[in-house]
Amino acid sequence: MIEFKDVWFWYDDGKYVLKSINFRFKGGTLAIVGPNGSGKTTLVKMMNGLLKPKKGDVIIDGINTRDKSVAEMSRLVGYVFQNPDAMFFEENVFKEVAFGPRNLGLSEEEVEKRVRWALREVGLEGFEDRSPLELSGGEKQRLAIACILAMKPKYLVLDEPNTGLDERGLRGLINVIRKLREDNHSIILVTHDMELVLEVADEVLLLKDGEIKFFGPVEDFFKLDLRNFSLVEPEIIKIAKELKLRFVRNVDELIKVIGL
């Protein structure tokens, strides 16, 4: 479980970024959303110790992040940054994914097993000898996820994972997140994309001006007037509301509910 207890964060200039943050995330897929500058990335960087609270505590499975280094917390909370290109430096995909497990001091047999498993999880089997730099945007994003998965953290943070992806890349990302969820990975997703939230999230945490404005099930989140938070309501939700239908995530579910 990830727990924030009265967490505050501010910079040296006195600007408050997070104010009295309290919530518990027990597992599944959590989307963290909100306007630009609301504190989303600051919040998730506290989960693996990249930032420490100025006040309050972040507890991950009973471990206070104040008491551990970033390296120690990264074994528990994996972090995939917004721009995956910055992560890549090896000559091929296999070596890229193997780097993390090797740093853990694992045997080559275990390293290879983890690499094959991680690539399979993200749909990149057969890419082992490819250069990371020649992959498409969607493939690079999935490779970045595989690199973290191979370390086998319990929690996986994806910071704006769909930035720069075309429709095909986005569909591939959605499929990967769904598969990870089915395989019992716990995912924390930072995004502005409400379509992505609708497709994959179990719970949503909404930030504005450094404060939590909503935390709860995704179906309750989409009952809010998202215009108040500079967020765009998905067309599927608009249609469902106009027709007074139950909560639906996508076109396929909408068709089933309507009975077409």
From Swiss-Prot:
Disulphide bonds in the chain: none
Repeat as UniProt keyword: no
GO terms for biological process, alphabetical: cobalt ion transport
Keyword check for Nucleotide-binding: yes
Xref: PROSITE patterns: ABC_TRANSPORTER_1, ABC_TRANSPORTER_2
GO molecular function: ATP binding; ATP hydrolysis activity; ATPase-coupled transmembrane transporter activity
Primary residence: membrane
Binding site for ATP: 34-41
Its membrane topology: Peripheral membrane protein
GO cellular component entries: ATP-binding cassette (ABC) transporter complex
EC number per UniProt: 7.-.-.-
Record domain ABC transporter: where: 2-234
SMART domains documented for this protein: AAA
Cellular localization per UniProt: Cell membrane
Keywords annotated in UniProt: ATP-binding, Cell membrane, Membrane, Nucleotide-binding, Translocase, Transport
Assigned protein family: Belongs to the ABC transporter superfamily.
Function per UniProt: Probably part of an ABC transporter complex. Responsible for energy coupling to the transport system.
Protein name: Putative ABC transporter ATP-binding protein PYRAB01300
